[in-house]
Amino acid sequence: MKKIVVLGCGLVGRVIAEDLSQTYTVTSVDISQKNLDNLKSESISKICKDVSDSAVLNEIIKDCDLVVGALPGFMGYETMKRVIMAKKNIVDISFYPEDPFGLDKLAKDNNVIAVMDCGVAPGMGNIIFAHHDKMMKISDYECLVGGLPKKREWPFEYQAVFSPIDVIEEYIRPARYVQNKSLIIKEALSDTELVEFDEIGTLESWNSDGLRTLIQ
């Protein structure tokens, strides 16, 4: 059975590990024992270590077939780089600020498959766009994405659905998008507008830096 190491056992990493454990041999790694204790699947091996230490990381991933990165954004890029240098394939969901294409040559030189930005958006939004781009001619693309709690409570009616530090980062990092073939950079939370959704009601949207690789 394939061996997968999931780095990070937070809100998202925990779910990834539990889903994968139904089919694969999974090891979950986190610096917090409390996070690891929240895992429901007894088949998941747990390692409480700090993977910012290269020696620790290399020892943990040396026998695995695939690494899944689910660490906070500030750790994502460097961790992905070190996994590639260890010649391990990696799928990553971290919301880091660095340009992921900076790792392209390194991945090719090490014969590694490295897939970045595999969340909802960026991630699923990119895949949906690519699918429709094959099916029809697209001249404009706008992606609206959000995480909403089942129970909406004032004043924000919002809930952090991934690493809180990255939620904050999403709302302060400059937002980039392409208009008339030119790269436009605006402040996060700019150009607010109200959007209506059936059975949900009125929501507010604004610019955030979520297109990522689509900008290329």
Ranges and model annotations:
Residues 12:
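Hydrophobic/small residue at the entry helix of a nucleotide-binding pocket
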Residues 7, 136-216:
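Active-site-lining helix/loop region of Rossmann-like oxidoreductase modules
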Residues 51-63:
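Conserved Rossmann-fold cofactor-binding substructure of NAD(P)-dependent oxidoreductases
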Residues 42-53:
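Rossmann-fold cofactor-recognition segment
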Residues 28-31:
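Conserved acidic E/D residue at the C-terminus of a beta-strand in Rossmann-like folds
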